[in-house]
Amino acid sequence: QSDVGIVKKTNQDSYCIFTANSKKYGNILFAVVCDGMGGLEKGELASATVVKRFSNWFEKTFPILINNISPNFGIIKSEWDKILKRLNSDIGNYGLSNNISLGTTIVATLCVQNEMYVANVGDSRVYKVTDKVTRLTNDQSLVAREISAGTLSIEDEETDSRRNVLLQCIGASQKLEPEYKKYRLEQDAVYFLCSDGFRHEIKEKELLGLLSPKIISTERSINDTLLEIINLLKERKEQDNITCVAFKTMA
């Protein structure tokens, strides 16, 4: 689900979610959320370009890849790293030649054979919901660095005036350094990817109450719940675009 929100004229977020079934590897899920830079011109172009490039990879390159070799973290990381470095260069060059600033975050997940591979640039996130809410990515932001250094408390994270300052951004970083992680997929859990607009005005305790695997039973109930959360965020005057993609693993 994605919503322009109550302030911005355009939705600079982009996302995709695909499922596939392989005889060899069973059910496969691929999802991406990108947040085009707010305040930067053409943010929606940057985020849509990244989502399209990754969608093409999943639909065209990935089937050939898994036909020849078993997918593993090293191979997927290498594939994604090449795409991200090329995108950083392409979007950066487009900005230079058109004299505009543009960029985007990304969080991408590939679930295959009970494993989840994650790529992250910027401050879009992946969470896991079981009997608690667990964040699975680290923000590449100034505020996250200050928290890590102990100069800012985690309680002040959402209210700090510098919360939108990114240390890494596709199209605007001289040297792009994506973060890659591998997780074992947990049974009977809800996973979600989101742009920062989805999380500023809601507490993790509330997300647990709404997205608990005990409550979420079908694709429809996931979509209904995400719409409910988006409407709640708009009532709370969230200023940003709001995007979230969620899925549940079965028990």
Predicted regions and their residues:
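PP2C/PPM-type serine/threonine phosphatase catalytic domain
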Residues: 1-251
